[in-house]
Amino acid sequence: MKIPAQLALITALAASTLSSHADWPQWRGPHRTAVVKDPAHPFTKINADPKNLWQIDVGPGQSSPIIAGDAAVYMDGINGQEVIHVLDLKTGKERWKAQVGPMVEFQNAYGEGPRCTPLVDEDRVYAQSCGGEFRCYSLKDGKQLWAISFEKDFGAKWFGNKNPDPGSKETASRRHGNNGSAAIDGDRIFVPVGSPENGTLIAFNKLTGAKLWAAGSDNTAYSSVVVGTLAGVRQAVHLTGDAMMGVNVATGEILWREIVKTGAKRNVATPVLDGDTVTIASTSIGTIRYRISGKAPEQTIAKAWENKEMKTVIGTPTQSGNLIFTIGPGNKCDLVCLGAEDGTERWKTPGMGDYASITVINDKVFALNSNGELVVAQADGSAFKETGRLQLCAKTWASPAYDNGRFLVKDGSKLTLLTLD
């Protein structure tokens, strides 16, 4: 049936309005870009003494918190289990909690507990454990609606801290956990299952859990799935342990694939989509932008630019307009501004520790480093222009959620809702 142009425009505007809601319902916010506009809160002055609206004790884990409507959602570790919690956003009072899967013991600096950020879509919340247990719950009361196991259902072998083969120099791409977040588009949810035999990326009906298609034969790494339209084709883009691929959301056909070799298969950053381009970063290859062209069923990927010096260990770049804000390289990272059109460095400033989550709100860059220090600067390519700096929390690798002037911040022992203006 042909839709009248006026109706199509109204539908598009309605979808745009819904998607621009101020909530932070998933990893990196409403559009998975870590960029939002909130004219009501220009942050012209940053309060050096933030106001805590509430604060609660939490268990271990580096999973980031999210905000959906009047609910705050987070995951932590309790008594050997990874647990999802839903709270009243206004008061911090718990509404319900549920066990997602057994905790995994890790031998690294990031500690134990969940590492994947939950996802809210309408009246449902989706959670994933490090060990690959994936659950869909009712956001209202915590009733489990459907579930899958990466290993039991799809044969995605869990290596933990071990190498996949005795004596092998290769390391398991998921040895630090199944950390990449799923993504939703329409009635489909795209889950990074990571089974070489049964699908790297698998699409399910988001309401029933019915499998729709499976694509790829790579192990997953730690990168989250992102959905967008590239060269006119709606696709799920996924950075695996070995490559990056674009998958047709409707059919599961792989539209393009590019080998991305990094040490220990450590592909962590979420791909950044901009028009027909995809930007990725890693500790081995630096930062690279690719351009996608052509039509389905087979598209072409070509390198637009690369900055080999801009190596990022576990951070994801954030693009705002024609600027990219990122971190790297090394364990004492700089905050860096790149030009999106050519990848050249515009400016850099030290002091980010070994990680920083970067959020852009209006014309301000908010960089929360691993030591819990928040650095605020103008989103300006001419020079680093700091507008605020304060200690926000203890050591953390979790990204904050933002909603209507409020920040939801999680470290290793506290979850805090606070304001800065």
Describe the function of each predicted region.
Residues 1-3:
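N-terminal secretory signal peptides that target proteins for export/translocation
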Residues 6-16:
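Bacterial N-terminal signal peptides
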